[in-house]
Amino acid sequence: MANRKIFLITSLIISLLLIHIFIFSPLNEPEKNAKAGPLGLSDVSVPSAPKLPAKDSTDFEVFLENPVIIFSRPGCPYSAAAKKLLTETLRLDPPAVVVEVTDYEHTQELRDWLSSISDISTMPNIFVGGHSIGGSDSVRALYQEEKLQSTLDEWTHNKVLILPTD
């Protein structure tokens, strides 16, 4: 019984420390007087793109505001297949957001950042509820195995639905 209490207290302390580190520790020192928008892009260049974390912050709001995000590379057949499945074949509510990584001035930094938080360095990199579920092959397999809705439910806490198509 005493070992269980020690384990629970230790687990709680470690969890609180990790939350503190995640929320309050910037990846880099902020730039002084930075005027560029997220990832060095002016805010008016890509009006339909979601707000992405600045290269000098731990701002993960993009994942809170957009439960399904497809980080994509134009011209990539795997990116095209994932976008087609999640934006045309299926009707998601809310709809998936497509982020073309080459639209950003700091493309390589964005790709490195995505790789660091997901251990996936290829495109597309599909995030559901802030968690990478892999690329085109992974999402296609979930769809074919009829596990996509349960994955969406699990990672978004039932906030994304696959609606019937017309």
Curated annotation (Swiss-Prot):
Residues covered by the Glutaredoxin domain: 56-159
Alphabetical keyword list: 2Fe-2S, Iron, Iron-sulfur, Metal-binding, Nucleus, Redox-active center
Positions that bind [2Fe-2S] cluster: 76
InterPro entries documented for this protein: Glutaredoxin (IPR002109), Glutaredoxin_euk/vir (IPR011899), Glutaredoxin_subgr (IPR014025), Thioredoxin-like_sf (IPR036249)
Top-rank taxon: Eukaryota
GO cellular component: cis-Golgi network; cytoplasm; endoplasmic reticulum; fungal-type vacuole; Golgi apparatus; Golgi lumen; nuclear outer membrane-endoplasmic reticulum membrane network; nuclear periphery
GO biological process, one term: cellular response to oxidative stress
GO MF annotations, alphabetized: 2 iron, 2 sulfur cluster binding; glutathione disulfide oxidoreductase activity; metal ion binding
Pfam family, one: Glutaredoxin
Described purpose of this protein according to its UniProt entry: Monothiol glutaredoxin involved in the biogenesis of iron-sulfur clusters. Binds one iron-sulfur cluster per dimer. The iron-sulfur cluster is bound between subunits, and is complexed by a bound glutathione and a cysteine residue from each subunit.
Family to which the UniProt record says this protein belongs: Belongs to the glutaredoxin family. Monothiol subfamily.
Subunit structure: Homodimer.
PANTHER family according to UniProt: GLUTAREDOXIN 2
Name this polypeptide is given: Monothiol glutaredoxin-3
Species for this entry: Schizosaccharomyces pombe (strain 972 / ATCC 24843) (Fission yeast)
Lineage: Eukaryota, Fungi, Dikarya, Ascomycota, Taphrinomycotina
